[in-house]
């Protein structure tokens, strides 16, 4: 086998406790085809999609600068056949269980392109999924993430516009099917998006300590807004599911608590963020943790906020109250 295995490290920067993901990276030979897009493609694979080979073949004909195919299990596929059929594709094979965000971090570390389109093997990927003109237009907007329109198998629209609010002192996110081009949305549905890679890395990528995909996705998106970045909708970019839409598990758990401490609890004043000690008792009341574990989690988040105090532009209160004006 000509490909050489490499060890990969998460792109999560020093704003988190860095974590090395044990994985193998193979392939990625220089293609003789000229790339027409100054964009990389990241394909998240479930391992059981019947569209796998067709999607990879179509991606190689789209003109992407680089293609990174990310597996969710080391036993999901015939490696030798894929490397032979798609030598230009770089395959990331995790050797341990990792969340989607962790795997996207690894893929982002493997690309130098200014932008990356994150996809899944559960959607229809055509050779015209992203044209050169649309790619240039999206990249020129210089925002952290641009969210595509998404359609279900039956061609019905999937909600992609999410608006933050508060209900009974708890974050309440409402969805809306009515969308227009360039409208803001709180987060990208199912991680789908056209990402600015430099902004992604400056934000620190996904937090590996948040295990549940919904909260991991929401954490990075919320952080982007609080740190002065934007996420918006493009009606010119669209994706369609070829399989059932995955259920979204937003059940509050320890992942939600980590999200709360990093995003909802900090207060920004005079250009600095702080997680006040006065927030500990309310946090303890909602956490259902023992006093020592609750204090450990609170202290960890407080240290993180302190390290990044100057990165915050606004706090959650301002984001929610001024939504649509920012």
What are these regions (language model features)?
Residues 128-162:
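Conserved donor NDP-sugar-binding/catalytic core segment of glycosyltransferases
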Residues 187-195, 199-204, 210-237:
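A short, conserved alpha-helix in the catalytic core of glycosyltransferases
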Residues 251-260, 269-326:
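Non-catalytic, C-terminal membrane-associated alpha-helical segments of glycosyltransferases
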């Amino acid at each position: 086998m000509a490909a050489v295995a490499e060890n990969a490290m998460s792109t999560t920067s020093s704003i988190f406790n860095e974590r090395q993901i044990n994985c193998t990276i193979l392939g990625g030979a220089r293609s003789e085809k000229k790339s027409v897009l100054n964009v990389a493609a990241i394909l998240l694979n479930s391992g059981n999609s019947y569209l796998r080979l067709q999607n990879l073949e179509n991606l190689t004909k789209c003109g992407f600068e680089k293609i990174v195919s990310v597996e969710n299990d080391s036993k999901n596929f015939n490696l030798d056949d894929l490397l032979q059929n798609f030598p230009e594709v770089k395959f990331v094979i995790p050797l341990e269980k990792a969340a989607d965000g962790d795997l996207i971090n690894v893929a982002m570390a493997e690309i130098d392109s200014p932008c990356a389109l994150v996809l899944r093997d559960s959607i229809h990927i055509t050779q015209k999924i992203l044209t050169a003109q649309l790619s240039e237009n999206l990249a020129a907007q210089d925002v952290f993430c641009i969210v595509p329109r998404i359609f279900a198998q039956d061609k019905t629209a999937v909600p992609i516009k999410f608006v933050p609010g508060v209900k009974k002192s708890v974050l309440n996110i409402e969805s809306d099917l009515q969308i227009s081009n360039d409208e803001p949305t709180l987060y990208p549905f199912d991680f789908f998006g056209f990402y600015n890679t430099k902004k992604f890395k400056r934000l620190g990528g996904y937090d590996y300590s948040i295990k549940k995909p919904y909260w991991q996705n929401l954490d990075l998106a919320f952080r982007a807004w609080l740190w002065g970045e934007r996420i918006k909708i493009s009606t010119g970019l669209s994706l369609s599911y070829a399989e059932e839409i995955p259920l979204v598990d937003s059940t509050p758990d320890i992942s939600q608590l980590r999200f709360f401490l990093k995003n909802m609890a900090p207060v920004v004043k005079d250009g600095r963020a702080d997680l006040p000690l006065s927030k500990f008792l309310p946090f303890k009341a909602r956490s259902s943790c023992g006093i020592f574990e609750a204090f450990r989690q609170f202290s960890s988040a407080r240290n993180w906020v302190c390290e990044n105090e100057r990165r915050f532009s606004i706090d959650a209160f301002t984001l929610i109250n001024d939504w649509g004006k920012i």
